[in-house]
């Protein structure tokens, strides 16, 4: 019998029950006990579904109220002083929420902890804050209580915890200025490891046999000091009475292979979707009795698995390892939707190509039975059905568009060049006549319940096209008038017609499909529903021109056209796996180029092409960066270079660290870049200062992920810090990101303050 297990299950619920419960608690509409009851019900349902699929150990510890790294940070008692947590007391739920979002039903608001991308995914984690001499202790009981919950329901459990070195690698602190690999962070291990030891001892006391300890940092470029630390750390942790399954994912071990194989752990999980070529070396390097967990089902995409190929890859290793070969998804299933059963509106053909979390576990079970030689006819029938679905997808005429193929064949000859920036900016200033420290927003304005109801009624047919258009026009006019009243310089139309910055465009492009309930967690309670790129991408008609032109007709101030860039659409979609991602991105760039040209022709003088995801697309290994950055930058320029020098091109990036890709950002050659900087206290600007970034830049002056309204003096101080690093004539004033998730009262107060801050700076 082949053991199958799972690294983690989506925590949000099939109907986003967790999101709704958490937000109701934040709003005071639900008690803490009701929230905890929702959590218990979700965990029970998720454990049962995994057990029903044949998972040998259900994962415990993959559930989180906001973020699993934040859960672990609070378990360790690593609460920054500004949150006022009493020394030695258990960390309560509201403290956790204040760390994640700045406020909670109880406790004083405080600046939220930094949030950034989880490796190269579209999930965000809350960054641990580290200080020299920091102390740690077991400060929350949730993990242990959830183990007992699962056991009471009759499940064998496998607790899942972040490994100490990955947790430190992800952490930041002012004293650790050398970045993730700062060796000073390793000095915290002496205080940290006893707490890990205590956790493992307590889990053993609950009857736990295996603990999954996640160390995805092992797939990164590690300094030698960190490699050495792995050996020392796991020599100590191996003394615990539980068996450790060390999990790596998102890439291969590569030059860290010897380090991983030398660790005294009972099992090792590797990602064979991202790095199938490591299988032989890993298997041959195992010690006697050591388990190999093979991550063969893609935990990050939604296509059915080629089980025949997986069987062919695994058969020799199964022969070698026998029962010591375990099967699992490549990584946690956090990154895919919960269940295809909720997709009642996808056509049968496309539905047959897909696999969500529940289906991936079923695939895993089928693969395990086939690998173990199960003689049940249902196994062969299942393999045959899988084979037929893959063949149907390969042969479907829906995938290939001859017109797109023809255009792609000639895209190399399409210009990516614009006039020099100095020439462009002079022309743009003469046309736009903007003041010093011009103010703008990033694009979206609050999406009220009324706006969401409008879109919902229109999509369901309850609202006619003309009634919907009139209602959206009214919303746009209100946003324009509001911005004029506040005194913003470059306006936006507010995007009331858009449910999501990627899904909106996907609905208007050929080659995309959409789920009804394919939600995945992005951060906190924020969920996104990524489109599915299943075929060649083309733009049948203009997508934004009508709304932008209408908004511009209402005001003499410039109104930005708002587009999502090709790399971000790619990164935030589930992308076809039958051609290189680069090819799909170029198809997107050509479609967006047509839209940019049409916006200019409609009188739009400022066009923003958002690329918040360009850094997250970076391969995890630096040796692979150049190839990616070359085509990513080329795709951006392909989408923007069709307009004249008087048209000002903006781009926006958020949740990013720029130091190591600043040259490529400059090569994108946007006239203005707006970035997230407020949570980092403008530290991200150092990259632009050191590089002598040549174009205009708008460093975000307040954090839109927090409901806290910023003080004017604080925003002025942030901009003065920016002006100390960059020429003030090239600085813009703007929020960190779009305002979609904020309420109107806090939005109005924050923007009034932001405009006042800009006026203060001009008067100085």
Swiss-Prot record:
Keywords from the UniProt entry: Amino-acid biosynthesis, Metal-binding, Methionine biosynthesis, Methyltransferase, Repeat, Transferase, Zinc
A GO BP annotation: methionine biosynthetic process
Residues reported to bind 5-methyltetrahydropteroyltri-L-glutamate: 16-19, 117, 526-527, 572, 616
Positions contributing to L-homocysteine binding: 442-444, 495, 610
Residues binding Zn(2+): 652, 654, 676, 737
Pfam families on file: Meth_synt_1 (PF08267), Meth_synt_2 (PF01717)
Pathway recorded for this protein: Amino-acid biosynthesis; L-methionine biosynthesis via de novo pathway; L-methionine from L-homocysteine (MetE route): step 1/1
InterPro entries, sorted: Cbl-indep_Met_Synth_N, Cobalamin-indep_Met_synthase, Met_Synth_C/arc, UROD/MetE-like_sf
GO molecular function, one term: zinc ion binding
Cofactor remark: Binds 1 zinc ion per subunit.
Catalytic residues (positions): 705 (proton donor)
Presence of the UniProt keyword Methyltransferase in the record: yes
Catalytic activity annotation: 5-methyltetrahydropteroyltri-L-glutamate + L-homocysteine = tetrahydropteroyltri-L-glutamate + L-methionine
Residue sites binding L-methionine per the record: 442-444, 495, 610
Family according to the record: Belongs to the vitamin-B12 independent methionine synthase family.
Cross-referenced NCBIfam families: met_syn_B12ind, PRK05222.1
Functional description taken from the UniProt entry: Catalyzes the transfer of a methyl group from 5-methyltetrahydrofolate to homocysteine resulting in methionine formation.
Protein name: 5-methyltetrahydropteroyltriglutamate--homocysteine methyltransferase
Organism listed in the record: Bordetella parapertussis (strain 12822 / ATCC BAA-587 / NCTC 13253)
Name of the coding gene: metE
């Amino acid at each position: 019998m082949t053991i199958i297990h799972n690294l983690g299950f989506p925590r949000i619920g099939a109907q986003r029950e967790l999101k709704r419960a958490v937000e109701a608690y934040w709003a005071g509409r639900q008690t803490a006990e009701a929230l905890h009851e929702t959590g218990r019900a979700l965990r029970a349902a998720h454990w049962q579904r995994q057990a029903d699929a044949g998972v040998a150990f259900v994962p415990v510890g993959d559930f989180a109220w906001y973020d699993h790294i934040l859960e672990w940070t609070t378990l360790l008692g690593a609460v920054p002083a500004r949150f006022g947590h009493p020394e030695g007391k258990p960390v309560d739920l509201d403290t956790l929420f204040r760390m994640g979002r700045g406020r909670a039903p109880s406790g004083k608001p405080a600046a939220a902890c930094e949030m950034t991308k989880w490796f190269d995914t579209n999930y965000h984690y809350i960054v641990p804050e580290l200080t020299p001499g920091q102390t740690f202790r077991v400060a929350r009981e949730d993990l242990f209580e959830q183990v007992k919950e699962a056991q009471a329901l009759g499940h064998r459990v496998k607790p899942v915890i972040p490994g100490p070195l990955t947790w430190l690698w992800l952490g930041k602190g002012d004293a650790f200025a050398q970045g993730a690999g700062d060796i000073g962070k390793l000095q915290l291990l002496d205080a940290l490891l006893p707490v890990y030891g205590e956790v493992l001892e307590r889990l053993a006391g609950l009857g736990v046999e295996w603990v999954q300890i996640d160390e995805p940092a092992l797939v990164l470029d590690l300094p030698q000091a960190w490699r050495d630390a792995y050996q020392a750390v796991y020599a100590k942790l191996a003394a615990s009475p539980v068996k450790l399954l060390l999990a790596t994912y998102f890439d291969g071990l590569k030059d860290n292979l010897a380090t991983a194989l030398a660790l005294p752990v009972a099992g090792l999980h590797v990602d064979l979707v991202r790095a199938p070529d490591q299988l032989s070396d890993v298997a041959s390097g195992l010690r006697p009795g050591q388990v190999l967990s093979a991550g063969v089902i893609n935990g990050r995409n939604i296509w059915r698995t080629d089980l025949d190929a997986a069987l062919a890859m695994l058969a020799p290793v199964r022969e070698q390892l026998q029962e010591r070969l375990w099967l699992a998804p490549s990584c946690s299933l956090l990154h895919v939707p919960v269940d295809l059963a909720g997709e009642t509106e996808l056509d049968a053909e496309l539905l047959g190509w897909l696999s969500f979390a529940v289906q991936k576990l079923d695939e895993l079970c089928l693969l395990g039975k086939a690998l173990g030689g199960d003689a049940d006819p249902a196994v062969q029938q299942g393999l045959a059905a899988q084979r037929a679905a893959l063949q149907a997808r390969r042969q479907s005429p829906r995938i290939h568009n001859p017109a797109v193929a023809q255009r792609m064949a000639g895209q190399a000859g399409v210009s990516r060049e614009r006039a020099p920036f100095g020439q462009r900016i002079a022309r743009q200033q003469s046309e736009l006549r903007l003041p010093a420290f011009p103010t703008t927003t990033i694009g979206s304005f609050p999406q009220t319940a009324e706006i969401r109801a409008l879109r919902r009624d229109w999509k369901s047919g309850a609202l006619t096209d003309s009634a919907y258009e009139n209602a959206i026009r009214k919303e746009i006019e209100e946003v324009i008038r509001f911005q004029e009243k506040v005194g913003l310089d470059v306006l936006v139309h507010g995007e009331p017609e858009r449910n999501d910055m990627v899904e909106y465009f996907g609905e208007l492009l050929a080659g995309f499909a959409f789920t009804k309930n394919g939600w995945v967690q992005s951060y906190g309670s924020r969920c996104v529903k990524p489109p599915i790129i299943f075929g060649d991408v083309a733009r049948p008609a203009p997508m934004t021109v009508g709304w932008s032109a209408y908004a511009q007709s209402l005001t003499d101030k410039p109104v930005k056209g708002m587009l999502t860039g090709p790399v971000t659409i790619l990164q935030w979609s589930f992308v076809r796996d039958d051609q290189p991602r680069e090819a799909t991105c170029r198809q997107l760039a050509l479609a967006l180029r047509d839209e940019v040209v049409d916006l200019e022709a409609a009188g739009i003088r400022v066009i923003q092409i958002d690329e918040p995801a360009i850094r997250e697309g970076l391969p995890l290994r630096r040796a692979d960066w150049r190839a990616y950055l070359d085509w990513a930058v080329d795709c951006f320029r392909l989408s923007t270079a069709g307009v004249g020098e008087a048209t000002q091109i903006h781009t926006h990036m958020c949740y990013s660290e720029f130091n190591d890709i600043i040259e490529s950002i400059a090569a994108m050659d946007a006239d203005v870049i707006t970035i997230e900087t407020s949570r980092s206290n403008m530290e991200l600007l150092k990259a632009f200062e050191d590089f002598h970034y040549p174009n205009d830049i708008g460093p975000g002056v307040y954090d839109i992920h927090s409901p806290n309204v910023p003080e004017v003096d604080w925003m002025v101080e942030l901009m003065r810090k920016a002006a100390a690093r960059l020429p003030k004539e090239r600085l813009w004033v703007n929020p960190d990101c779009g305002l979609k998730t904020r309420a109107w009262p806090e939005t109005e107060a924050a923007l009034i303050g932001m405009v006042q801050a800009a006026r203060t700076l001009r008067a100085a």
